[in-house]
């Protein structure tokens, strides 16, 4: 199944993309996945004349469940996500495209007015999505304790809400929740996979 010439082609049927396709990825607003999905929509679907909308979910697994419901539903997943290996193995999914989209800047963020010092890294618990945590190891050389959440945006929100003091998050989430970077690390070079609904054929 591929997007081609204003239709979605499968072995058995062609679906008109004038019906609107949905790009699913990890939310909430402010995630690097949202950033990549918007980039994909701008640089691929719009240029192809494809009508599309973005839908954000709490997990990539929830995105995949939506994709399995319709050939008009797609999911974008970063290759840094450990669970992506399971998606490649599924016979009911199909890898349609791989593209590069570097993430926004990542760094350590705190609430305005919070007095941060570097020695806090020796004892503080940092809230983060699992995928980027090695940034702290490589840039600070410290063995840090983490409180893991579903997304970088969720990490930033926990700091905004006063549930945590320091988040490893990206620039979009930092801006969204009004936080302040006390350290910046890098924009992560990243590749992404686009999955669509596969076709299972009985081999018996």
From Swiss-Prot:
The keyword tRNA processing does not apply. It catalyses: prephenate + H(+) = 3-[(4R)-4-hydroxycyclohexa-1,5-dien-1-yl]-2-oxopropanoate + CO2. Pathway: Antibiotic biosynthesis; bacilysin biosynthesis. It is found in: Cytoplasm. GO terms for cellular component: cytoplasm. This is Prephenate decarboxylase. Part of the bacABCDEF operon responsible for the biosynthesis of the nonribosomally synthesized dipeptide antibiotic bacilysin, composed of L-alanine and L-anticapsin. Bacilysin is an irreversible inactivator of the glutaminase domain of glucosamine synthetase. BacA is an unusual prephenate decarboxylase that avoids the typical aromatization of the cyclohexadienol ring of prephenate. It is an enzyme of class 4 (lyase). The lineage of its organism: Bacteria, Bacillati, Bacillota, Bacilli, Bacillales. Its EC number is 4.1.1.100. Coiled coil: none annotated. The keyword Transferase does not apply. Keywords: Antibiotic biosynthesis, Cytoplasm, Lyase. GO terms for biological process: antibiotic biosynthetic process. Belongs to the prephenate decarboxylase family. GO terms for molecular function: carboxy-lyase activity.
